[in-house]
């Protein structure tokens, strides 16, 4: 059985439709392998990736390793309920990007994974 870590998106904009303000393409990765995804967010908006763990394994560390140029990315929530938040700069529309790493141990795999997030700011 392979250890899978899935990231799910939640919008933190109260009262706004989730897909209109913030949407992240679904993706899955294994510890020790890299992947990428795309986030769609409104100009000036905030989007959060909640890291959802499977029933086994553990996370050793999470860090934003490459900062966005037209917004900011941050790690919040600790190891128990980890999340990566992106806040776009108000008035900016266009492409942005950031990256973060997750280091952990699963049943069959362990290691550092880099997740690159391309951001489409509307």
Where are these regions (language model features)?
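Extracellular/luminal low-complexity segments enriched in Ser/Thr/Pro
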Residues: 83-93
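A short beta-strand micro-motif common to beta-rich folds, especially ectodomain repeats
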Residues: 93-106
């Amino acid at each position: 059985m392979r250890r899978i870590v899935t990231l799910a998106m939640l919008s933190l904009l109260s009262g706004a439709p989730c897909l209109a303000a913030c949407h992240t393409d679904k993706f899955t990765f294994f510890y020790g392998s890299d992947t990428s995804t795309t986030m769609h967010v409104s100009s000036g908006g905030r989007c959060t990736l909640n890291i959802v763990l499977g029933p086994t394994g553990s996370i050793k560390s999470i860090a934003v390793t490459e900062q966005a140029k037209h917004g900011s990315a941050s790690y919040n929530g600790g190891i128990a309920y980890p999340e990566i938040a992106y806040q776009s700069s108000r008035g900016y529309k266009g492409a942005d990007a950031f990256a973060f790493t997750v280091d952990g141990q699963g049943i069959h795999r362990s290691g550092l994974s880099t997740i690159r997030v391309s951001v489409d700011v509307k």
